[in-house]
């Protein structure tokens, strides 16, 4: 996998068996040959390539990539600016505007480069088939990533929106890290506790209290 040269590799190799790693490689080869898969193959591991373990300050968990053409870029919730923001991302930006201020761009690459690990639990999706790759090969890898941050990382903020993301809470050492939970930003649930949750300012407060640089969320 392209992750072999990254800071994540030792933890992935420790948590996953060689068979599991090989299954991921084979899965990628077969899926991208047979059908339209998102994100583009070279961006499947974008979150882990852009945000190293030692630089991770915040983790924002997603479920799986957007399944529309041109949307997914390997970062949870993020889409290129050339593509309209999906409803959940629109609500994330609304909450950010209320919490800290307005952000013009809905491409969240700058967050990733600052240390926000934008991690989906499932890293691929077939076109038009949301969550179709859940339960196949990805969860052991992404669960290992969460555990790596919890075990080896400095004090970090885990932002878990919705029940699915919150199911990952069991992998996090809350004596060392901050876990922020709220309803999912989907239009179906955003008014049931997502709006008004102030995750961005709370994250920065925790980071500065623990001697880490805050995130410039508006950049």
Curated annotation (Swiss-Prot):
Per UniProt, subcellular location reads as: Cytoplasm
Leader sequence range is none
Q: What is this enzyme's catalytic activity, as reactions?
A: Hydrolyzes single-stranded DNA or mismatched double-stranded DNA and polynucleotides, releasing free uracil
- Residues at the catalytic site: 64 (proton acceptor)
Annotated keywords? Cytoplasm, DNA damage, DNA repair, Hydrolase
Q: Answer yes or no on keyword DNA damage.
A: yes
Recorded E.C. number(s)? 3.2.2.27
- List the GO terms this entry assigns under cellular component, sorted alphabetically: cytoplasm
Single GO biological process annotation from the record: base-excision repair, AP site formation via deaminated base removal
Write down the superkingdom of origin. Answer: Bacteria
Q: Name one Pfam family in it.
A: UDG
The GO molecular function terms of this record are: uracil DNA N-glycosylase activity
Keyword Cell membrane carried by entry? no
Q: Known CDD domains for this protein? A: UDG-F1-like (cd10027)
Job of this protein: Excises uracil residues from the DNA which can arise as a result of misincorporation of dUMP residues by DNA polymerase or due to deamination of cytosine.
Family (UniProt):
Belongs to the uracil-DNA glycosylase (UDG) superfamily. UNG family.
Protein name per its UniProtKB record: Uracil-DNA glycosylase
Native species = Leuconostoc citreum (strain KM20)
Source taxonomy: Bacteria, Bacillati, Bacillota, Bacilli, Lactobacillales
